[in-house]
Amino acid sequence: MSKNKLSKGQQRRVNANHQRRLKTSKEKPDYDDNLFGEPDEGIVISRFGMHADVESADGDVHRCNIRRTIRSLVTGDRVVWRPGKPAAEGVNVKGIVEAVHERTSVLTRPDFYDGVKPIAANIDQIVIVSAILPELSLNIIDRYLVACETLQIEPIIVLNKIDLLDDEGMAFVNEQMDIYRNIGYRVLMVSSHTQDGLKPLEEALTGRISIFAGQSGVGKSSLLNALLGLQKEILTNDVSDNSGLGQHTTTAARLYHFPHGGDVIDSPGVREFGLWHLEPEQITQGFVEFHDYLGLCKYRDCKHDTDPGCAIREAVEEGKIAETRFENYHRILESMAQVKTRKNFSDTDD
């Protein structure tokens, strides 16, 4: 996932379009006023094709059509909308989304065919959910962290299923998580099964809009169920008995309210973070502990691998940077190059 980067001129045009839409929605509606009520503020709970569920300030959810002039609308967008009035035969008319407020953040995912697609808007933090089963993968955690740093959205690492650890296993996992604690990331250890550790997580979620990211099988949906107080069948990623991997059931991004305060957007679009569209320099910047050593290498075009005089490699050798993180950095770069090669090969076949 990535955050669209606009030039100053493009940003000015986007802002002007937002203001024009907001002004038009209040002064010159394009639709018959007899069909719709007064403009109101709301937030998009979910998007379905050319329709969206919008929650009003009083907490009611309204199914709305979307104006054709609105090019992009995703869960989490703050909008101006108008409720539909009851028709003559007593059937309620759908409301209409008139305009979209400027976003504070937008999460997108790269797509081979359609470029970059928005997934959700106005996210405050990304909760990276991992687990000791099926496998604790620091490489996957590092990929998520690079995406968060690129998006400039705060991450929280949550390790689930700690109830399955014995004392020795807990000591090992804590040692692994210290790698992230030591470079400033917040790490929480929880169990959605026993609900151990949920209180600190609830506090971290209160008053913020979060999105949970995690591979299949880590118990992300079970954790959301425990936090939301929902029944198992409402949000679930059941684990296959044969593979140990979760079976996805969520089909559209949707915003939920936590009972303790705060919101979460549950989206199938953040199961994996595609990084292949990023430049190598962006990946390097995504490793926060590298920052103090950038620009100190002997050669300006240093690849931070076997290059002589590489300040980052020297920091690894001196124990200032975790070797595991350094290895994952190169794994990410290698996987990016492979994906780009496949994409370029596919493009030449068309």
Swiss-Prot record:
Sorted alphabetically, the keyword list is: Cytoplasm, GTP-binding, Hydrolase, Metal-binding, Nucleotide-binding, Ribosome biogenesis, RNA-binding, rRNA-binding, Zinc
Q: What's the EC number here?
A: 3.6.1.-
Renumbered to this chain, region (Disordered) spans 1-33
Q: Name one Pfam family in it.
A: RsgA_GTPase
Q: What class of enzyme is it?
A: hydrolase
Annotated compartments = Cytoplasm
Q: Where in this chain does the record put each CP-type G domain?
A: 104-273
Give me the residues that bind Zn(2+), please.
297, 302, 304, 310
The entry's free-text remark on the cofactor is: Binds 1 zinc ion per subunit.
Q: Where is the composition biased (Polar residues)?
A: 1-17
Protein name (database record): Small ribosomal subunit biogenesis GTPase RsgA
Give the classification, highest ranks: Bacteria, Pseudomonadati, Pseudomonadota, Gammaproteobacteria, Enterobacterales
One example of the protein's molecular function in GO is: GTP binding
Name the positions where GTP binds.
160-163, 214-222
Q: Tell me the InterPro entries matching this sequence.
A: G_CP_dom, NA-bd_OB-fold, P-loop_NTPase, Ribosome_biogen_GTPase_RsgA, RsgA_GTPase_dom
Q: Name one GO cellular component term.
A: cytoplasm
What cofactors are annotated for this protein? Zn(2+)
What is the species listed in this Swiss-Prot or TrEMBL entry? Escherichia coli O139:H28 (strain E24377A / ETEC)
Q: What does this protein do?
A: One of several proteins that assist in the late maturation steps of the functional core of the 30S ribosomal subunit. Helps release RbfA from mature subunits. May play a role in the assembly of ribosomal proteins into the subunit. Circularly permuted GTPase that catalyzes slow GTP hydrolysis, GTPase activity is stimulated by the 30S ribosomal subunit.
The record's note on quaternary structure and interaction partners says:
Monomer. Associates with 30S ribosomal subunit, binds 16S rRNA.
Q: Does the keyword Isomerase apply?
A: no
- So what family is this one in? Belongs to the TRAFAC class YlqF/YawG GTPase family. RsgA subfamily.
A GO BP term, please? Answer: ribosomal small subunit biogenesis
Write down the HAMAP family for this protein, in alphabetical order. Answer: GTPase_RsgA (MF_01820)
